[in-house]
Amino acid sequence: MQAARFVVSGVVQGVWYRASTRQRAVALGLVGHARNQADGSVEVVAAGSAAALDALEAWLWQGPPAATVAAVTRTACAVPPTEDFVTG
């Protein structure tokens, strides 16, 4: 299992970005979380197969219809201690 931390910036808060990310992550078989950050970005930490992480990254660039994504940064991270994908 691999893990990645994504930081998504743009118009990504108040547009169902976290909930939509959770739906996509669960469909891809990923675990982790999506959280709003004080600077207006959304942090996504996800763990699963490399292919699923790549698919999530591609989706993060699009997001839900009301979102306008300006940037997605990806870094490796430790596998999160969870068996689900949560928002917070």
From Swiss-Prot:
Gene behind the chain: acyP
InterPro entries in UniProt: Acylphosphatase, Acylphosphatase-like_dom, Acylphosphatase-like_dom_sf
Annotated EC: 3.6.1.7
Protein name according to UniProt: Acylphosphatase
Organism: Xanthomonas euvesicatoria pv. vesicatoria (strain 85-10) (Xanthomonas campestris pv. vesicatoria)
Reaction catalysis annotation: an acyl phosphate + H2O = a carboxylate + phosphate + H(+)
PANTHER family, alphabetized: ACYLPHOSPHATASE
Annotated SUPFAM superfamilies: Acylphosphatase/BLUF domain-like
Domain of life: Bacteria
Family: Belongs to the acylphosphatase family.
Protein keywords: Hydrolase
Enzymatic class: hydrolase
Cross-referenced Gene3D superfamilies: 3.30.70.100
GO MF term list: acylphosphatase activity
Ranges where the Acylphosphatase-like domain occurs: 3-88
Active site feature: R18, N36
